[in-house]
Amino acid sequence: MNNCTPNIKSSYGYEDLLASGRGELFGKEGPQLPAPTMLMMDRVNLMTENGGLFDKGYIEAELDIHPDLPFFGCHFIGDPVMPGCLGLDAMWQLVGFFLGWIGGKGKGRALGVGEVKFTGQILPTAKKVTYRIHMKRVINRKLVMGLADGEVEVDGRVIYTATDLKVGLFQDTSSF
């Protein structure tokens, strides 16, 4: 795998992310992002094949917060907060996106996480969530797998951290 795909860029806008969800960005054999309302980012500001804390790759993405986001209406009524699992899922989404960006093929699946810590919350009054992913390792064998650490920041404050985020790309998910 390498980053010599014809559509390689270092940043992606919302329309690009939607194209990924339709299988158009990295091709039909590449991993896809989910479509809205499960797509947890509005843009990817920076992707590098090197860099990050481990010099194995770095991703920075953002989600604009609006009070009318669907989860605020039901989680919880009278006490709206973005579910923490959605921030965790966003980090998995970005690891899978990185694997497609470097040329990986297959259907992306979250495989696990070492440790997650929540030290804050995302309320409808927030303005922006920033995700930072530090790739630790990419394995390219029968299974393509990415391993990374990540953090979620709201309005400049880190509120979630995750270690050993694992995402795999599968050619066949029928036995997964």
Curated annotation (Swiss-Prot):
Pathway: Lipid metabolism; fatty acid biosynthesis. GO terms for cellular component: cytoplasm. The lineage of its organism: Bacteria, Pseudomonadati, Pseudomonadota, Gammaproteobacteria, Pasteurellales. PANTHER family: 3-HYDROXYACYL-[ACYL-CARRIER-PROTEIN] DEHYDRATASE, 3-HYDROXYDECANOYL-[ACYL-CARRIER-PROTEIN] DEHYDRATASE. Necessary for the introduction of cis unsaturation into fatty acids. Catalyzes the dehydration of (3R)-3-hydroxydecanoyl-ACP to E-(2)-decenoyl-ACP and then its isomerization to Z-(3)-decenoyl-ACP. Can catalyze the dehydratase reaction for beta-hydroxyacyl-ACPs with saturated chain lengths up to 16:0, being most active on intermediate chain length. It comes from Haemophilus ducreyi (strain 35000HP / ATCC 700724). Pfam families: FabA (PF07977). Homodimer. The gene is fabA. GO terms for molecular function: (3R)-hydroxyacyl-[acyl-carrier-protein] dehydratase activity; trans-2-decenoyl-acyl-carrier-protein isomerase activity. InterPro entries: FabA (IPR010083), FabA_FabZ (IPR013114), HotDog_dom_sf (IPR029069). Belongs to the thioester dehydratase family. FabA subfamily. This is 3-hydroxydecanoyl-[acyl-carrier-protein] dehydratase.
